[in-house]
Swiss-Prot record:
Pfam families: Ribosomal_S20p
Gene name tied to this protein: rpsT
Protein name: Small ribosomal subunit protein bS20
A Gene Ontology molecular function term of the record: structural constituent of ribosome
InterPro entries: Ribosomal_bS20, Ribosomal_bS20_sf
Protein source organism: Mycolicibacterium vanbaalenii (strain DSM 7251 / JCM 13017 / BCRC 16820 / KCTC 9966 / NRRL B-24157 / PYR-1) (Mycobacterium vanbaalenii)
Biological process according to GO: translation
GO cellular component: cytosol; small ribosomal subunit
Function: Binds directly to 16S ribosomal RNA.
Similarity comment text for this entry: Belongs to the bacterial ribosomal protein bS20 family.
Record key words, sorted: Ribonucleoprotein, Ribosomal protein, RNA-binding, rRNA-binding
Amino acid sequence: MANIKSQQKRILTNERRRLRNKSVKSSLHTAVRGFRAAVEAGDKDKAGELLASTSRKLDKAASKGVIHKNQAANRKSALAKALQKI
């Protein structure tokens, strides 16, 4: 454990952020997995709805600093491409 008071506080904030980031990334992973399952099933309507919700989640994660904005853009592009292939 750190001896400096500011570092003790930093340890606590880092842990809170780590847990928040873990939660957001987990929900992103679940959303993308659901979208890919709909694409593999060939359900274009459901995949379109899931693409919109997944894109919102990616944008929100990027705006909160959980993932980089370019990573969000690349993932959204790949998902849109997958939808177009149906």
